[in-house]
């Protein structure tokens, strides 16, 4: 687990953009979190009962590329001070998904009614952070240009299993010119806690993708003649694994509605 | 120019493997330098009269990926102490090529008879160094497996010209599985003074390569169905540029017969 300390939050100091974004999410005023609080890390959420949390933690430990943990709570504690002093995991995402036995049973804007003393929250790094670094280097991000969701694919790359958690790695795809793909490997290698370097490029069929035009999640994007598809491990992997495990109880974020933290993306760079 | 200091050479100390290799070359006992003194940097050689050396130096400065200078001499001085205290550039390569007006006129085992007070020697990093790092990471190098020369191609990537020196970048190609190609980008990015990260991967036609099975220099190698071609800037570029410039006088190394230096490959790693 990456241990990072966020700047402190104090009522007397100017409000951080991330805190303002989180307060807006808490108040139910966010339709999506993409674009909120630029420069700040957003994360995927997975909440599990303590009796499953150890297995899930081990799953993440063994599969750090799709499941990089950037913060987690104590058992039963809805706070994660390392990601924001005021942060309350029960209220600070715009929308949640509540799962029972592998079925989504509720999609509430807070989980006060679902919180239990045995729950553990995991916050997992997301590609927004490395996309910001790619764009800062003026690399084009096709799905952002086209205004659609990133295309994602189930692969034939098996995650290392842990307890009930097992399944294939899900990857996101961004088409790039070869020289930009090389640059993207360099840039994203600096960000191991938000999926890091690509896991694959070119040759979609080598990782079990039969039709690049038909993603399993998200939307298809154009791949130009002078571009190759570049694949990164994706934070949808743990969500798919939790759903496939049909565990008695779990809570996740609703797609596109992430947790905004007080960590800055640049803090995640290892170099 | 990368400034590095080689370990000192003293008659009293145990002889470095690089010094032993250089003495063997000096005595004319080396048929090739590949495999000599493992761990030590080998370099391409280009020697030009002072009135052309400034332009050539500027060419290298502007094209650091194909022409990374790892050492150069003072005008008229055959020593390059930073690469080896005892090193004599006139005798320490197994074989040289002497060029007049763009034609090779001699291929001697030393250049004592050709040395002049106005000559400047440039030693340029070579791919042996990064191939050693790739193999240390257990990545396969196809031309080494097949026992042939690395395939090299003229591209449509124009070098930045300087004085009479101009022309396309020449690249070397190594086929790799996509995940190994990503790893190779990371590894070779650590070695900017020996060509650094690849300049291209996949899509040979994008850089003007019409038939990957017909290299312009070296030998063809097998590319398996699950591999992509990965292209690095190549030290043949400055040699091709010197030949194309048809300069009145130049000396280079003979292909495959490089200068063995006292620098260690691991010293060249920036991380």
UniProtKB/Swiss-Prot annotation, chains A, B:
GO molecular function: lyase activity
Protein's name in the database: Putative hydro-lyase RPC_1666
Claim: Lyase is one of the keywords in the record: yes
Pfam families for the chain: D-Glu_cyclase
Biological source species: Rhodopseudomonas palustris (strain BisB18)
Enzyme category, top tier: lyase
Family to which the UniProt record says this protein belongs: Belongs to the D-glutamate cyclase family.
Family annotation (NCBIfam families): PRK05463.1
Gene3D superfamilies membership: PSTPO5379-like, PSTPO5379-like domain
Keyword Lyase recorded: yes
Enzyme Commission (EC) number: 4.2.1.-
Alphabetical keyword list: Lyase
Matching SUPFAM superfamilies: PSTPO5379-like (SSF160920)
Classification via InterPro entries: D-Glu_cyclase, Putative_hydro-lyase, UPF0317
Cystine crosslinks: none
